[in-house]
Amino acid sequence: DGGIQWVRQQVASGVDVTTVVEKGKAAFIGPELYKKTLGVIGLGAIGSLVANIALSLGMDVYGYDPFLSVDAALRLDRHIHVVKDINELYKRADYITIHIHYTKDTERMIDAKAIGAMKRGVRFINLARGEIVDDDAMLAALDTGWVAAYVTDFPNNRLVGAPHVLAMPHLGASTPESEQNCAVMAVDQLRDYLENGNIRNSVNLPAVSQERSGVCRLCLIHKNVPAMLASI
């Protein structure tokens, strides 16, 4: 609607819109994605999808996820480089996109040290949670040019209007259909846990998905300590 309104205003003022648009195109020149390297932090349902799509666009893709599940690994194209050291991703990626949960462990995970390990001129995309990125460190890196651009789905007073920051409203699920789908998904997953003990999309528990082999099942959650089960 904003774009349509702008055109109407220009036409009403007697402005040649075609000339203005052609002249302004130079402000939007940017590098192509083809043959660039993308780093994907978090290879869950969303991260693995992003990685596969980026590969189809001709990008070289590196992924990092210390908690990569078997299901997520099977979804990944075999040409995606999965690294065990996040610094390997940092030093290679022209673009970095992050898709992880926000927890105490991931709060300000992208700090000055992490940014310093990245390539100069990296473009960083945060569609996960705002708290994962240290705004002070990111703005400082943007000011020096170490980070060329920062795209975030979590605008605040400091980021909105800052140079080289593209801040978008958090609108990914703002449709009537998605609101209903989210509610149905939550109920389905809760019911699956209560009836079958399966755990899906949990932030603080590992994924559990096993078919029933009898009337009852016994599940023990414990630390990975040798001889723990034998002592129970």
Where are each of the predicted segments found?
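A conserved regulatory-domain signal marking ACT and ACT-like small-molecule sensing domains
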Residues: 200, 204-232
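Aromatic pocket-lining residues of Rossmann-like dinucleotide-binding sites
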Residues: 53-54, 118
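Glycine-rich Rossmann-fold phosphate-binding loop(s) that bind the pyrophosphate
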Residues: 36, 43-44
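Rossmann-like adenosine-cofactor binding region
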Residues: 35, 66-158, 174
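Rossmann-like dinucleotide-binding domain for NAD(H)/NADP(H)
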Residues: 120-212
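Hydrophobic Val/Ile/Leu positions in short beta-strands of Rossmann-like dinucleotide-binding domains
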Residues: 38-40, 220
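Phosphate-binding beta-alpha-beta segment of Rossmann-like dinucleotide-binding domains, i.e.
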Residues: 1-37, 201
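N-terminal Rossmann-fold NAD(P) dinucleotide-binding loop
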Residues: 47-48
